Structure formats: C-alpha cells, structure tokens
C-alpha cells in the first residue's frame, strides 16, 4: 500500500553559495554521521552536488512521509547512502520508525548542473 510520494528540486549554485559562507557547518547541520564520513572523503569540487542531492533526497523523503523536515522528522533522522551499484538507499532513525508500521522507501536522485532532483515513494510492508 502506498504511504506517500515526495519530490524536491535544488539549485546546486544555491548550495555553492551556502558553502562559501558557512563552509562545512552546513554539511554538519544536514548530514547524518555516515554521510558526513563520505562527505569528508570527497574532493571539494564535489561537495556542493553531494550536499544538494542529500538535501533534496531528505526533503523528498520527509514529504513522502507527509510531514516535511522539522515537523516530526529532521535532516539527521534520514541517512542517504548508496549500494554497491550506486543506487541510493535510505535509513531512517529508529526513534522515528518506532512510531510507524514497517515500510519500504524507494528513492531516485538525478543531477544535471545547475539542478538536482529527488523523488521518493514510501510503501507499507503490511
């Protein structure tokens, strides 16, 4: 059963401007620990695109839950990783998932400078 659908679009230059002002503080604000480890290993030229994709993915997932960021779920409650083939995977913190029936999240990410887009579908396992 479909729980929700969410999408988000981010202008990568917007993230570049934020990085120029706040540097890595922005990354620390939106990235979960596993993501932050990936971020620190990247070449700085890839930082803005990485953050734009994570930002848009987290917004899309929160919208698919029907709440949005800051209304029951926060940036660090959502972790976006990639499997061995590069497919994005989503982990949700247990303090949020304890309130819900089992579910699956499907996430698609794409970027073509200057735009990044994320599309999320959440379905029930029941």
Swiss-Prot record:
Entry keyword Transferase: yes
Function according to Swiss-Prot or TrEMBL: Transfers the 4'-phosphopantetheine moiety from coenzyme A to a Ser of acyl-carrier-protein.
Cofactor needs: Mg(2+)
Localization, UniProt: Cytoplasm
Uppermost EC category: transferase
InterPro entries xrefs: 4-PPantetheinyl_Trfase_dom (IPR008278), 4-PPantetheinyl_Trfase_dom_sf (IPR037143), ACPS (IPR002582), Ppantetheine-prot_Trfase_dom (IPR004568)
Taxonomic superkingdom: Bacteria
Family named by the database record: Belongs to the P-Pant transferase superfamily. AcpS family.
Gene3D superfamilies according to UniProt: 4'-phosphopantetheinyl transferase domain
An annotated GO cellular component: cytoplasm
Record keywords, A-Z: Cytoplasm, Fatty acid biosynthesis, Fatty acid metabolism, Lipid biosynthesis, Lipid metabolism, Magnesium, Metal-binding, Transferase
Catalytic activity: apo-[ACP] + CoA = holo-[ACP] + adenosine 3',5'-bisphosphate + H(+)
EC number: 2.7.8.7
Amino acids binding Mg(2+): 8, 59
One example GO MF annotation: magnesium ion binding
Protein encoded by which gene: acpS
Name of the protein in its database record: Holo-[acyl-carrier-protein] synthase
A Gene Ontology biological process term: fatty acid biosynthetic process
Classification lineage: Bacteria, Pseudomonadati, Pseudomonadota, Alphaproteobacteria, Rickettsiales
